[in-house]
Amino acid sequence: MKLNKKTVEDIQVKGKKVLVRCDFNVPLKDGVITDENRLVGAMPTIKYLVNEGAKVILCSHLGKPKGEAKPELSLAPVAKRLSELLEKEVVFAADDTVVGENAKKAVAEMKDGDVVLLQNTRYRKEETKNEENFSKELASLADVFVNDAFGTAHRAHCSTVGVADFLNEAACGYLIQKELKFLGDAVETPVRPFVAILGGAKVSDKINVINNLLEKVDTLIIGGGMAYTFLKAQGYTIGKSLVEEDKVEYAKEMMDKAKAKGVKLLLPVDNVVGEEFDANTTPVTTEDANIPEGYMGLDIGPKTSALYADAVRTAKTVVWNGPMGVFEFANFAKGTIAVAEAMAEADATTIIGGGDSAAAVNQLGFGDKMTHISTGGGASLEFLEGKELPGIVALSDK
C-alpha cells in the first residue's frame, strides 16, 4: 500500500468547498459527550482549512443507526461542542437524508472559512454498502475531499471511499498523515530492536497480525487471554482458562516460525489466576506457567511482567495492541500497568494500536508519554496485518 498520499497542505483549498470525513463517533450519555478526544483530534485539520479560507463541510458517522434516522444518534451535540472548540459557529444541517434541503441551503450560503456539519452518514443505509447514489450526493456538495477518519479507513463506505471517485482531488488530514507516518515507519522501517506486544482475548482476532509481525520484529510478546492457547501448545496445564482448541496447532506453527526467523517469542512464565471470572475472585499467583485445575488465568504474573518490561525497556520501537489481563478488574490489571509503565520509560518510539490498550494507557495517565496513540483499533490492526486500507488507497498519490 502506497503511503505517499497528498495531504491537506498539498492541495489548493482557498474558496473551495472541502468535504472532510472526520471521526466524530464519540460516546454520548443523555445527549452529552462523555469523551471528546476525537473532536479535539480533528481540530488541527479543521482549523487549517478554516484559516486557509476553505468552505469546510464536515461529515461523520455516530454509532450504528443501521440506515434509520435515530434521534439519539444525531450529530447535533457534536455541532454544539465543535462550535465551542473552534470558537466559531458550526452550522448543523439536520437532514435525516444527510444531503437534503438544509444541507444544500447551508452549503449554498457558505462564505470562505465557514463550517457546516452534516447529519450522521449512517442514517443512510447506502453508506455502509458504498452505494454510488449516496457517494454522488455527498460529492455534489463539494470540490475537494479530505479524509481524516483513520478509525474507519479500513471500511469501504460512501463517505470514506465512494465519494473520492466523484471528486478530482482526495487528500488526507493531519490525523491520518500522523497515523501513516508512525504506523508506516514502525512496520516498514523500524529502528531496532523492534518489539511488538499483543494481548487481548482471542488468537483468532490476531492470526494475521502475528503472522505478519513475525516477518518484521525482533521480539514478539504475547499476553492476555490469547496466551493460554500458546501455553497449551507448549504443553502446560491451563485449568479452565480461555482457550481456542482449534488454534493450538496454529500456535505451535507460530512458535516454530519464530524460531526459524530468529525472533524471540516471549510467553508468560507465571500467571495470576482466579476461580471465577469476577472482580472479587481471590487472585492467586502461580509458581510457573502451569495453571491448576479449577482456576483460570486472568493476568500475567510478576515474573512475566518483569520479563516483558525488560524487553520493552531495551527496545527502540514498540507497538502494543491488547491488554495483558482483565484490565477492568483492579486485581488483574497489574500486568497491563507494568507494560504501560515500561513503555512510558522506554527510550523508544512507542505506538499504541487503538482500542483497549489506548483506553488503558489513557486511564493510567501515560497517554502523553507515548509517541503515538492510534485513533483506530480495527484500522490499526489491519495495518499491522499488512492489509491495504480502502480509505487510504482512495486518496490521491503525491
Swiss-Prot record:
One of its GO terms (molecular function) is ADP binding. It is found in: Cytoplasm. CDD domains: Phosphoglycerate_kinase. Coiled coil: none annotated. Keywords: ATP-binding, Cytoplasm, Glycolysis, Kinase, Nucleotide-binding, Transferase. ATP binds at residues 206, 297, 328, 354-357. Substrate binds at residues 23-25, 38, 61-64, 122, 155. Monomer. The keyword Cytoplasm applies. It catalyses: (2R)-3-phosphoglycerate + ATP = (2R)-3-phospho-glyceroyl phosphate + ADP. Pfam families: PGK (PF00162). GO terms for biological process: gluconeogenesis; glycolytic process. The keyword Protease does not apply. It comes from Clostridium novyi (strain NT). One of its GO terms (cellular component) is cytosol. Its EC number is 2.7.2.3. Pathway: Carbohydrate degradation; glycolysis; pyruvate from D-glyceraldehyde 3-phosphate: step 2/5. Belongs to the phosphoglycerate kinase family. This is Phosphoglycerate kinase.
